[in-house]
């Protein structure tokens, strides 16, 4: 099993064989999580601190559950009551936590690159749970696992990513991962929600849902991130749904066995029809939630293995 990373900061730093290693190990954790006894000792004796500078009940709960099932001591840092709110810088917080000798830091931050900066200042492994518009690596990995289990492979597929591309770190991480795994990627969005320069990733760009969905194996819908918008990016939610919301009529242009994905939380009736989101024959949205726990377990397990090996080499060096 190949995984060389010291931290997991983005998909851009992972090679295809490392991505496959994460997915293969995550597959075994899916099986574990379906048992009555869902416990592993992969992180026994290790401390995991979750630092979420943005609210995210779903992702934080997934990381917390993943750590506990691996046997870690898990602490959720209450950022709203922390010294950060009193004026302490992110680096000061990082140095303070580093002095407590944690083993894993799971960090979500509204500023792109903030997690990379923090990782450069601590001695433990750092896992990016989403930073600004930059990356959300575990979301892309769990999406890849969901696709692989549904389609039997994660190569040579046509994947349509639809919605608010401009503000989405999920879109960026998926675009990088799917490209590394030799898939054909289409981005579908109104011009106001299509970021400049995105075509450099080798994807196809569309502003027409029906044309973009034609022959797609996978349809991945994205939430309108109104909290990141500082202007009028769409005429109205009603008009947006009419042109870019996924319903049965538009999905008919994709392949007959195309799967429907959404990273959540969903705005039903805005980016996706509620009935379609709940269709067990097409939607794998709940599968994505399940795969999320398994993928995060795999990522933390692999990072912990590398951390233990690094500390072992350091101890041998001191003894020598």
Swiss-Prot record:
Pathway(s): Pyrimidine metabolism; UMP biosynthesis via de novo pathway; (S)-dihydroorotate from bicarbonate: step 2/3
Q: Name one GO biological process term.
A: amino acid metabolic process
Keyword Iron carried by entry: no
Question: Would the keyword Transferase be found if you checked this record's keyword annotation?
Answer: yes
- Per the UniProt entry, the signal peptide is none
Q: Can you quote a single GO CC term? A: cytosol
- Pfam families from the entry? OTCace (PF00185), OTCace_N (PF02729)
Catalyses which reaction(s): carbamoyl phosphate + L-aspartate = N-carbamoyl-L-aspartate + phosphate + H(+)
Q: Where does carbamoyl phosphate bind?
A: 58-59, 108, 136, 139, 264-265
Q: Which InterPro entries match?
A: Asp/Orn_carbamoyltranf_P-bd (IPR006132), Asp/Orn_carbamoylTrfase (IPR006130), Asp/Orn_carbamoylTrfase_sf (IPR036901), Asp_carbamoyltransf (IPR002082), Asp_carbamoyltransf_Asp/Orn-bd (IPR006131)
Q: Which EC class heads this enzyme's classification?
A: transferase
Q: Where L-aspartate is bound, by residue?
A: 86, 169, 223
What Gene Ontology molecular-function terms does this entry list? amino acid binding; aspartate carbamoyltransferase activity
> What EC number is given for this enzyme?
2.1.3.2
> In which family does this protein belong, per the annotation?
Belongs to the aspartate/ornithine carbamoyltransferase superfamily. ATCase family.
Function field: Catalyzes the condensation of carbamoyl phosphate and aspartate to form carbamoyl aspartate and inorganic phosphate, the committed step in the de novo pyrimidine nucleotide biosynthesis pathway.
Q: Which HAMAP family match?
A: Asp_carb_tr (MF_00001)
Name of this protein: Aspartate carbamoyltransferase catalytic subunit
Provide the taxonomic classification.
Bacteria, Pseudomonadati, Pseudomonadota, Alphaproteobacteria, Rhodobacterales
